[in-house]
């Protein structure tokens, strides 16, 4: 009798999410995720930097974490300089930990701070990955409303007061203050100061995620919340994946040693890829300013194209706020429309979009929202894809 093999279904972790499907290729009109524009990738510069790296010290490749577990010094030094110049954060390279993307940065902080059943405050609409991590840990997630100026401090104060009256102290306030994901808002400086004051009053740290802060379309914006902090209340993270591309899995955490020494005990991957670190350090040390100006200009053109396409093909039935930068538009559909029913029909037309519920502390509160990433598709694909998407919503009973 033939061996039928082992039935793994009886062995799987009982808390696993539903199984994933096989990769079927990318859709023609790809508005999901944090994909970047291939035309903006500085391949010649990467080739030059890679050549410089391969002529360097072979011990960086032959040893685990040759320059220590926090990452290579040239990249940490570049980050410390960049954060001081562009975000107002004065730290030393010893206060920087290089991570394998910002997702690892988030999970390392969760590992250090969270226990099952803890409470965390987030923005009402927030990064889907961060929300997923929290739900897997069985964390009580409380969403606080945003407006055009970012997280509302009046509502945050109310939530903190209510929790305190119940004897609950949140482990942190997770915020994306600069080009918020998914809404694109920028927290005003007045609110940044107020957020710090509330952190001090209630003894709750701030978890500041600035993955998109490089992507302002023009000028500069408010300094990071971490730059205002003189009492170790702010944990700050960022990423190279949005400045270069998600194929570069590099992020970072800026934290004081009291937290850093704990983070290092939870980073069990034997070190973030050294080759990526070395190439990015070499390239950005010499080309960062020119590169980021080129990226901002390219993203702005695509943002303008997507906004115009939505207005032409959806008309006044959708609400769209023009962001000051970033990679996304947060689109509000008419009340009563559930975007989830259009995911399948859209995919049949080669169109992929992110359903709003994935980006909300309360999924049902975002049923009539979609998030569109404009970085990857060409301007022609943006116009074609949005025209087709409008037809999908109309043909399948949507009000758009």
Feature roles, as predicted:
Residues 240, 317, 357-361:
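Short, solvent-exposed loop/turn elements at beta->coil junctions and helix N-caps
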Residues 60-202, 207, 213-231, 299, ...:
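Conserved core of the PLP fold type I
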Residues 209, 356:
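Active-site glycine-centered loops adjacent to acidic/histidine catalytic or metal-binding residues
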Residues 1, 348, 363-400:
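PLP-dependent enzyme catalytic core of the Aspartate aminotransferase-like
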Residues 233-312, 319-323:
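PLP-dependent aminotransferase class I/II
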Residues 9-100, 284-286, 352, 395-400:
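N-terminal small-domain helix-loop-helix segment of the aminotransferase-like
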Residues 317-350:
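Conserved PLP-binding catalytic core of the aspartate aminotransferase-like
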Residues 254, 330-332, 373-375:
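Short hydrophobic/aromatic beta-strand micro-patches
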């Amino acid at each position: 009798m033939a061996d039928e093999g082992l039935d793994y279904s009886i062995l799987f972790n009982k808390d696993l999410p539903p199984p994933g499907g096989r990769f079927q290729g990318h859709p023609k009109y790809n508005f999901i995720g944090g994909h970047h524009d291939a035309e903006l990738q500085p391949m010649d510069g990467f080739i030059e930097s890679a050549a410089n790296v391969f002529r360097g010290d072979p011990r960086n490749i032959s040893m685990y974490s040759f320059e220590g577990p926090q990452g290579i010094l040239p990249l940490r030094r570049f980050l410390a300089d960049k954060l001081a110049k562009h975000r107002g954060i004065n730290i030393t390279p010893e206060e920087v930990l290089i991570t394998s993307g910002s997702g690892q940065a988030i999970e390392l902080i969760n590992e250090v701070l969270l226990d099952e059943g803890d409470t965390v405050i987030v923005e009402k609409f927030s990064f889907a990955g961060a929300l997923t991590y929290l739900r897997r840990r069985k964390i009580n997630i409380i969403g606080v409303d945003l407006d055009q100026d970012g997280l509302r401090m009046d509502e945050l104060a109310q939530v903190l007061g209510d929790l305190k009256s119940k004897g609950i102290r949140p482990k942190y306030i997770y915020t994306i203050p600069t080009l918020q994901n998914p809404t694109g808002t920028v927290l005003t400086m007045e609110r940044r100061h107020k957020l710090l004051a509330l952190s001090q009053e209630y003894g709750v740290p701030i978890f500041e995620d600035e993955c998109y802060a490089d992507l302002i379309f023009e000028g500069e914006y408010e300094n990071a919340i971490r730059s205002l902090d003189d009492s170790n209340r702010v944990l700050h993270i960022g990423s190279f994946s949005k400045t270069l591309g998600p194929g570069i899995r590099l992020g970072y955490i800026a934290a004081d040693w009291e937290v850093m020494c704990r983070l290092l005990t939870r980073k069990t991957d034997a070190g973030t890829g050294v080759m990526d670190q070395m190439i990015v350090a070499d390239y950005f040390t010499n080309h960062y300013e020119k590169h980021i100006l080129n990226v901002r200009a390219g993203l702005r053109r695509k943002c303008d194209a997507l906004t115009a396409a939505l207005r032409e093909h959806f008309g006044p039935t959708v609400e769209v706020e023009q962001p000051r930068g970033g990679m996304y538009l947060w689109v509000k559909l008419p009340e009563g429309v559930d975007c989830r029913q259009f995911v399948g029909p859209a995919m049949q037309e080669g169109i992929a979009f992110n359903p709003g519920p994935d980006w909300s502390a309360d999924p049902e509160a975002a049923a009539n929202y979609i998030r569109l990433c404009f970085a990857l598709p060409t301007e022609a694909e943006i116009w074609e894809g949005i025209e087709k998407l409008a037809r999908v919503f109309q043909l399948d009973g949507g009000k758009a």
